A protein has these predicted regions:
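Residue-level marker of regulatory loop/turn positions in helix-turn-helix DNA-binding domains and
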Residues: 6-10, 41, 56
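Short alpha-helical DNA-recognition segment
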Residues: 25-51
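Hydrophobic micro-packing sites on short alpha-helices
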Residues: 33, 63-71, 78-79
Length: 83
């Protein structure tokens, strides 16, 4: 059943960003991910990643794209549309 985007609080990728970091070999810390995103030209800190993962911060489309590239995962997967 499709979920209504109007009922979602925070962001829809919070858990998947955390899981995506854990799936890396070796697992990636929030600091590692922030460093990688900064190297790719995005101003992202470990604190921001923490807030995203705790569903305390929204993620814009450009950030979602960069997170997917940094983690080597599709945007659809990060949004929970793929297993």
């Amino acid at each position: 059943m499709a979920r209504s985007l109007f009922l979602i609080k925070g962001n829809i990728c919070a858990e998947r960003v955390r899981l995506g970091r854990a799936m890396q070999k070796p697992p990636m810390t929030q600091e590692d991910l922030a460093r990688k995103l900064q190297f790719m030209g995005m101003d992202m800190t470990a604190l921001i990643i923490s807030r995203i993962e705790k569903n305390q911060r929204h993620v814009c489309d450009a950030e979602l794209l960069m997170l997917s590239k940094a983690l080597g995962l599709s945007m659809d997967w990060l949004c929970g549309n793929e297993d």
